[in-house]
Amino acid sequence: MDFHARQFAVNRPPCGKTRREFFWQFGGGFAAVPLIDLLSRDGFFEQQTHAAQIANRSTFATATPTTHFRPRAKRVVFFFMQGGPSQVDTFDYKSALSKYQGKTYSGGLQIGSNGRKIGLLTPSAFSFHQRGESGLQVSSLYPHLANFADDLCVVRSMYCDTPTHSPGILQMNTGSIVVGRPSLGSWLNYGLGSENESLPGFVVMVDPRGGPRGGAGAWSAGFMPAVYQGTLFRSRGSTLLNLRTPAGISNRSQRRSLDLLETLNQQHLQQRPGYSELSARIQSYELAYKMQTTATEVVDLNRETAATLDAYGLHRPETADYGRKCLLARRLLERGVRFVQLYSGGGAESWDAHDDCISNHRKHAAETDQPIAALIADLQQRGLWEDTLLIWGGEFGRTPTSEGVGKPGRDHNHYGFSMWLAGGGVKGGQAVGATDEVGFRATEDRCHVSDLHATILHLMGLDHEKLTFLHEGLEKRLSGVQPRRVLRQVLA
C-alpha cells in the first residue's frame, strides 16, 4: 500500500468499523448495559454526533464566515521552501560570522543531523543591503523581492522541535511532528469555509522534482472529515487530471449518473453516520463535476497578457515552474480559494544544502525570487493585497557553521531560523525577534511554530484557543496544549 493509501486508511479498519463501533452494534442484550455506560464515559456518543454534524456540513461559506473577531486577511498563500533555507544567507545578516570565521562554535547546543561532524563558523557568501525606507536587510539572492522590503515582516526568532525533514515539515504544516493531524489549510477551511462552491478551498502545488518528505500528511485533514484536506494541483502538464468529460458522454448523461451515485452513497451513509471519508467522497464527486467548467477556466493561463506572463517569469526556464504556480495562485485567490500552498524544492533538488550551499541557494532563490515578487505586485495592483496573507519559510533553518569540504554546505538547524509574513494585517518593513551573535539560536522574542500558527489564525479572525475540533473526547487545537501566544509585533 502506497503512502497516499495508508494516509487515508489510517482512521478506518478493513472491516469498515472501529472497535468501539463493532461492540456497540453487536453488543446487544444484558451485556450491552455496562457497555453503554463504558462507551458513554469514553465520549463515544458525543463523538458520533459531532462527527455526523461536521461530516455533513458543507465547506462552502454562503455568507460571511463566523469569526472570533474582525479578520485582517481572508486568504493565504504559503511559499514553502522545502529542505530548510539558511537564515544567515537570506534574511538574517550576521557580521560576526566574518569576525569568527574558521572558529569552532561553542554555544553548547547539540547540533548536526545523523551524527555528522560540526564544522567551523562560516560567513555568508552573499552580500546584504538595507532596502526600502525601512532599511530591512535582504540578501543579494533576492534582487526582485528586495524591492518589497517595506512590505515584509521577517521573524528572525523562529524555532521548532526537530532537525529532521519529515517531522519538521509535518510540524510546520500541522503543529505536530507525528502524522495524523489536520494541516493549517484544513483548520482554516474548517473554521472559515470556502468562498467558491465550484473550487476546493485548499489547494497545494508541489515541486515537479518531488513532493515533500512525509508525503500527503502535510496537507491532510487528519482526524477531521476528509473534505477539509488539500487538493493537489500540478504545475506541469495538465493541472488537474481527468478534468474533461470523456468523449461520447453528454453533460446530461453524466449528471444523471452522478445523481444516482449520490443517492446510493447517501443511503450507505445513513447507515454509517459520521463516516467522514464517504461524506467527503460524495462532496468531491459534485465538486469535480462543477470543476469541469470552473477549473478549466482558472487554469487557462492563455487568458493572461504577455506582459503578465513575462512578469511572472514564464518565459524563462529557471522561473517558469514557480512562476506558473504563483500565477495560478493569484487566479485561485481571485475566485475565492481560501488557502494555497506552493512548494519549492523536491526530491534530491531541494533547499537541503549539505553540500555547496552557495550554488544550492543561488539556484533555488533564482527560481522563486521573480515569481514571488510578481505575485506581490499583482496582488497590490488588483486590490487583493490588504486582505491576502503571504507566508514564506521552510521546515527549519541551517547552521552558521560549514559542513563538508571543498564546496561546503550547512547542516540542519531547528534552534533558530527566519520566516517572513506580508500582506493582510502585517506590519511590513521590520524584523521581529533575533538569533544570537552568529545566528544559531533564537534568543529574543522567540517564536515557536505554534506561536506562528496562533498568529496566522489571529490575522484570519480566529482565536487559536477557541478554534477546536472534538476528537476522541478531547477538544483538539492547531496550536496544541502548551501555552502559545500571538506575535503582536507582527500585527499592523
Predicted regions, residues:
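Ligand-binding pockets and gating/stacking loops
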Residues: 1-492
